[in-house]
A protein has these predicted regions:
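Short, small-residue-biased leader/transition segments that mark boundaries at the very start
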Residues: 1-5
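Glycine-rich ThDP/TPP pyrophosphate-binding loop and its adjacent helix/strand module
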Residues: 8-186
């Protein structure tokens, strides 16, 4: 991660203008960026915000959703990772937010619910976003936390923890084996 604060460096990935934490500030920034692009008549600008299902428990997030819908920010795509786990446990026990799709529609979003591990569905969802006008889009991705690494899958303890060297090797071996299987199918 490269610095004393162990955060993502937003300057290392082109197009990633900021990274925030789990308290929901990112979506407020994203709606501001989308509104600014509209104000400046920058029809070429698309803003993407990635949130987790634990993060959408924050009130600030829902205020930003209301703002995005009120101003018809059709240049905003909100991607919500619905894996059912957060650092404190299952989202259904900590602060249930289901049904997210109905709530997003009620807040004025177009919604698409997909398998967040299916690349074809992800591509289709983003194509859908690019063809819609008049309202923001929410792509709801049903996922499995730690997918592809046997000892991490659906384990809340891995939410904010890095693997040690031995665990890292096991994880990379498992992921590389899956990659080889996929490449053999092509």
């Amino acid at each position: 991660l490269g610095d004393v604060y162990k955060r993502q460096n937003m300057n290392s990935v082109p197009g990633v203008d900021m990274s925030t934490g789990s308290l929901g500030q990112g979506i407020s920034c994203a709606t501001g960026m989308a509104k600014a692009a509209k104000y400046l008549h920058r029809d070429d600008v698309r803003v993407y915000a990635l949130l987790g299902d634990g993060e959408i428990e924050e009130g600030e997030v829902w205020e930003a959703f209301l703002f995005a819908a009120k101003y018809k920010l059709d240049n905003l795509c909100v991607i919500i990772d619905l894996n059912g786990l957060q650092i404190d446990g299952p989202t259904s026990e900590v602060m249930p937010t289901d049904p997210v799709d109905a709530k997003m529609r009620d807040f004025g979003f177009r919604t698409v619910t997909i398998d967040g591990h299916d690349f074809a569905q992800i591509e289709d969802a983003f194509q859908y976003f690019h063809t819609q006008t008049g309202a923001p889009t929410a792509v709801l991705m049903n996922t499995t936390k730690g997918k592809g690494v046997s000892y991490m899958e659906n384990q809340v303890g891995w939410h904010g923890k890095a693997p040690n060297d031995e665990e890292y090797k096991i994880a990379m071996d498992e992921l590389n084996a899956q990659l080889a299987e996929l490449e053999a199918q092509v």
